[in-house]
From Swiss-Prot:
Source organism (scientific name): Pasteurella multocida (strain Pm70)
Gene Ontology terms: cellular component: cytosol
Protein name in the entry: Isoleucine--tRNA ligase
Localization per Swiss-Prot or TrEMBL: Cytoplasm
Essential cofactor(s): Zn(2+)
Keywords: Aminoacyl-tRNA synthetase, ATP-binding, Cytoplasm, Ligase, Metal-binding, Nucleotide-binding, Protein biosynthesis, Zinc
Membership in a protein family: Belongs to the class-I aminoacyl-tRNA synthetase family. IleS type 1 subfamily.
Record-linked CDD domains: Anticodon_Ia_Ile_BEm, IleRS_core
Known function: Catalyzes the attachment of isoleucine to tRNA(Ile). As IleRS can inadvertently accommodate and process structurally similar amino acids such as valine, to avoid such errors it has two additional distinct tRNA(Ile)-dependent editing activities. One activity is designated as 'pretransfer' editing and involves the hydrolysis of activated Val-AMP. The other activity is designated 'posttransfer' editing and involves deacylation of mischarged Val-tRNA(Ile).
HAMAP family, alphabetized: Ile_tRNA_synth_type1 (MF_02002)
Motif ('HIGH' region): 59-69
Cofactor, how bound (note): Binds 1 zinc ion per subunit.
Enzyme kind, highest EC tier: ligase
Lineage, broadest ranks: Bacteria, Pseudomonadati, Pseudomonadota, Gammaproteobacteria, Pasteurellales
Amino-acid positions noted as binding ATP in the UniProt annotation, renumbered to this chain: 606
């Protein structure tokens, strides 16, 4: 009769499910986290610890979140959770950017334009309501990602208190002397009818006219004298410029040349032209000129103030010197329209040349402009070309495809246009140099970020902070009606406005009666009607939020983390404002991540059909798979996502979950209070396993601390798959299942598993937050309610320095065991054995390996998972060495009976009898293990 020995075994048992079923389980966990006020419990547990402040860059409150948003928020959450585990107080206050044009456009579609279909005050209220709805929608999606934060009290740039603080930051910049009003060229969107910030400009390919234009010399003799032309040549003399914006020719007021460049007067067929020496050949080829004769040469500095007739207006323009002129293309003579180019404006100002002011806010030529009155700028391209051809000023016309600035919102070409605006001056009070100095004090991750933002700061123009919009924080200034000078009490008045905005929001500014603040002065001053650039809103959050929120205790932000496009966006605006108000950078570290692309490296696009949404991923795989994908990726470059890539993340997840389940199942019946074994009493292999976890934890903590999350996952997978899965957990099954339930051999093993589980759950919590919370509920022993309030486990220990069977020892054993497994696999293929336990091994080892294996005595077979293993000198070998030199393995099939309980082949009397080891474990005192 066959006896069932199942009840005599310590079989693994746990309520922790094998399948994650994340898409179904995670929402219930979120509900529990919210009901139990998890975020505030983390705050309480962290009170008094050193702080780490990651300041959330506000996403725009418009539309649903995309995969890039998910990457960004998950990276932030991993950092905040890992910093908490590393012993920091790391509050997370999510925020939203709520003012600005995109919301205005949406609301216009719903209620009409302000001051046409609806009052401006009603329009602002509609914008506020719309933004609030968008925030709620995005908030739900961010929470679903498993991101922990103060979601009940986020910062919104439209909160009255925040709006007031934005005005206060503005007032501080004014007080420190960084503000001025000027008419200078800014990016102008014809569709927005407003100026744009640098960060609101995108570059796309556009086909434009490419024209070479003649400006005839006013005094030909003066030109010939400057060029020392002995051969004077024949025909009209003209300076030739090149441009792709014919519509700016009416605004031309000068031609720029470089003082150190060589210029030549050359005969082109029957006319004479002035060109940079290095570009003569190129221009001749472009214009189809075959006969070229050099008539004279001169340095640019000697040609200054020569005058040339405007092609179709009755005035002349001078040659002026400019450092921006190069010979990279064109003619080396630069068409200069001060209204429509940054360099043009700077050089015109320097030379006392006034702007033309021909284009209105609507993008049309003003009514008094000859030839082009009432025409739009882009339609005027053809008209200007026709006019140039009519007057004989066109040397060459063609078309060119080139990169051209477009509005980020409308995707339409924009123009440079001079308008009266308010600016933060880069050279005022040494702002540019101070900002460059502050950049060097910041840690940039990856480090190329430093050079990138330095170059941007070096080259950026003054910051146009005013907008002609309705939904935005006001430029809260009073200016004199006649002189346009600021009121002498401006700083004080800005604070008075801020106090009112704090009570009633930005509408308080437009409702404000000037006399209320200015008294008798009210008749002489007007309120500025403009709003602040939304980049001022978000750029001032170091002031309006970080300095203000009590959770931050007046500390500055340790980290800003956004996509790499924010070097010219939020990182830039924050740096400029903080330097202007506080003379320092607002952050200590700046981390940037790349953009998401598909598996083939292509941008996400509706037309390609390769868009992956976070909502779809979570519905299919669950939030933890999305989080694991983010953590596994080197975020410093492009971040690839596809179904295949997510499936790989799901496979890795299963390995981690299976490891956790094995640990939990084998902790069945273990009470750490009662059963924990002291380190010195544990089996050597168990001590080594804890040491493995100890070493892994040090590396994982270091990787978290340095934001190397892919290194965290790699180390975690190595630990689960190799150190534990294919070695330790494999070996301990026999001891765990077959020894006496309360034996030292089993409790030692469970002690190791318990320590490892306590460590592992904390390692994965910043990334696999839902799964960690689930594991936490199943680990035996008293514990806090949530893993997220805990620091990394401090109960691990390293092997004693005097331990002979140290890590180096076990690494050698693993190498030899891998060789044994190779030989066993061959024996299986050769049908010598089926399962490994059918094998009896004779190992022939040299003087290095023999003593090493001998240390394990009769427990070597348990390490090798065979029924018998004996070691003999290599000289006795009757089989060849394998892949490890000095080591040979002979496999024979055991002739013994298989024990019905432990399945080892040994000294059982018959197939139904227990082996002596199992008999001792079932009926006696229990076997004694020393090593494994």
């Amino acid at each position: 009769m066959t006896v069932d020995y199942k009840n005599t075994l310590n079989l693994p048992e746990t309520g922790f499910p094998m399948r994650g079923d994340l898409a179904k389980r995670e929402p219930n966990m979120l509900k529990s986290w919210y009901e139990k006020d998890l975020y505030q419990k983390i705050r309480q547990a962290s009170k008094g610890k050193k702080s780490f402040i990651l300041h959330d860059g506000p996403p725009y409150a418009n539309g649903t979140i995309h995969i890039g948003h998910a990457v960004n928020k998950i990276l932030k959450d991993i950092i905040v959770k890992s910093k908490t585990a590393l012993g920091y107080d790391s509050p997370y206050i999510p925020g939203w950017d709520c003012h600005g044009l995109p919301i205005e456009l949406k609301v216009e579609g719903l209620v009409g334009k302000p001051n046409q279909n609806i009052s401006a005050a009603q329009f602002r209220e509609a914008c506020r309501q719309y933004a609030a709805e968008q925030v709620e929608g995005q908030k739900k999606d961010f929470i679903r990602l498993g991101v922990l934060g103060d979601w009940d009290n986020p910062y919104l740039t439209m909160n009255y208190h925040t709006e007031a603080n934005i005005i206060r930051a503005f007032g501080k910049a004014v007080e420190n002397g960084h503000l001025y009003k000027g008419s200078k060229p800014v990016h102008w969107c014809l569709d927005c009818a407003s100026s744009l910030a640098e960060a609101e400009v995108e570059y796309e390919d556009k086909v434009s006219p490419s024209i070479y234009v003649r400006f005839s010399a006013v005094d030909s003799d003066a030109v010939l004298a400057k060029f020392n032309a002995t051969d004077k040549g024949t025909g009209n003399i003209s300076a030739v410029i090149w441009t792709t914006t014919p519509w700016t020719i009416p605004s031309n007021r000068a031609i720029a040349i470089h003082e150190n460049l060589d210029y030549q007067l050359v005969q082109f067929n029957d006319e004479r032209v002035i060109l940079a020496k290095d570009l003569v050949e190129e221009v001749a080829k472009a214009a189809g000129v075959e006969q070229v004769v050099i008539l004279g040469e001169s340095k640019g500095k000697d040609l200054e103030w020569l005058r040339f007739q405007h092609p179709f207006y009755d005035f002349s323009v001078p040659f002026i010197l400019g450092d921006h002129v190069t010979t990279d293309g064109g003619t080396g003579l630069v068409h200069t329209a001060p209204d429509h180019g940054h360099d043009d404006y700077i050089i015109a100002q320097k030379n006392g040349i006034e702007m033309a002011g021909l284009i209105g806010n609507d993008g049309l030529f003003k009514a008094d402009v000859p030839f082009f009155a009432g025409k739009g700028v882009f339609e005027s391209n053809d008209l200007v070309v026709a006019k140039l051809q009519e007057v004989g000023a066109m040397l060459k016309f063609s078309k060119i495809k080139h990169s051209y600035p477009h509005c980020w919102r409308h995707k339409t070409p924009i123009i440079f246009r001079a308008t009266p605006q308010w600016f933060i001056g880069m050279e005022k009070q040494g702002l540019r140099q101070q900002a460059l100095s502050e950049i060097k004090k910041v840690r940039w991750i990856p480090d190329w970020g430093q050079a990138r933002i330095e170059k941007m700061v070096e080259n950026r123009p003054d910051w146009c902070i005013s907008r002609q919009r309705t939904w935005g924080v006001p430029v809260a200034l009073f200016i004199h009606k006649e002189t346009e000078e600021l009121h002498p009490r401006t700083v004080e008045l800005v604070e008075e406005v801020a106090k009112r905005v704090e009570q009633k929001g930005i509408q308080a500014w437009w409702d404000l009666d000037t006399a209320e603040l200015l008294g008798a002065d009210a008749d002489n001053y007007i309120k500025v009607p403009d709003t602040l650039d939304v980049w001022f809103d978000s750029g001032s959050t170091y002031y309006s939020v970080v300095k203000d929120r009590p959770e931050f205790n007046g500390q500055e932000a340790d980290m800003y983390l956004e996509g790499s496009d924010q070097h010219r966006g939020w990182f830039m605006s924050s740096l400029m404002l903080s330097t202007a108000t506080d003379n320092k950078a607002p952050y200590k570290q700046v981390l940037t991540h790349g953009f998401t692309v598909d598996g083939q490296g292509r941008k996400m696009s509706k037309s390609i059909g390769n868009i992956v949404t976070p909502q779809e991923v979570m519905d299919k795989f669950g939030g933890d798979i999305l989080r694991l994908w983010v953590a596994s990726t080197d975020y410093t470059g492009e971040i690839s996502v596809s179904d295949e890539i997510l499936k790989r993340a799901a496979d890795a997840y299963r390995r981690i979950r299976n490891t956790a389940r094995f640990l939990l199942a084998n902790l069945n019946g273990f009470d750490p209070k009662r059963d924990l074994v002291k380190p010195e009493e544990m089996m050597v292999l168990d001590r080594w396993a804890v040491d493995c976890a100890y070493q892994a934890q040090n590396e994982i903590k270091d990787a978290y601390d340095n934001y190397q999350f892919h290194a965290v996952i790699q180390r975690l997978m190595k630990f689960c798959s190799i150190e534990m899965g294919s070695f330790y957990l494999d070996i301990i099954k026999d001891r765990q299942y077959t020894t006496k339930a309360d034996s030292l051999a089993r409790r030692s093993c469970q002690t190791a598993l318990w320590h490892i589980a306590e460590a592992l759950v904390r390692w994965i919590a910043p990334v696999l937050s839902f799964t960690a919370d689930e594991i936490w509920q199943y680990i035996p022993g008293e514990r806090g309610e949530f893993v997220f309030t805990e620091e990394f486990y401090n109960g691990l220990f390293a092997l004693d320095a005097n331990e002979q069977m140290n890590d180096a020892y076990w690494q050698q054993v693993i190498t030899l065991r891998n060789e044994v497994n190779r030989v066993l696999e061959q024996a299986r293929n050769d049908k010598i054995i089926g399962a490994a336990l059918e094998a009896e091994l004779t190992i022939y080892a040299n003087d290095t390996y023999a003593p090493l294996l001998a240390k394990l005595q009769n427990e070597l077979r348990f390490v090798l998972l065979t029924s018998k293993a004996e070691v003999k000198p290599l000289a006795d070998a009757d089989v060849a060495e394998g892949e490890v030199k000095g080591f040979a393995v002979k496999v024979v099939r055991s002739a013994n009976h298989k024990c019905p309980r432990c399945w080892h082949y040994s000294d059982s009397k018959d197939a139904e009898s227990l082996c002596s080891r199992c008999d001792e474990n079932v009926n006696g005192q229990g076997e004694v293990r020393q090593f494994a």
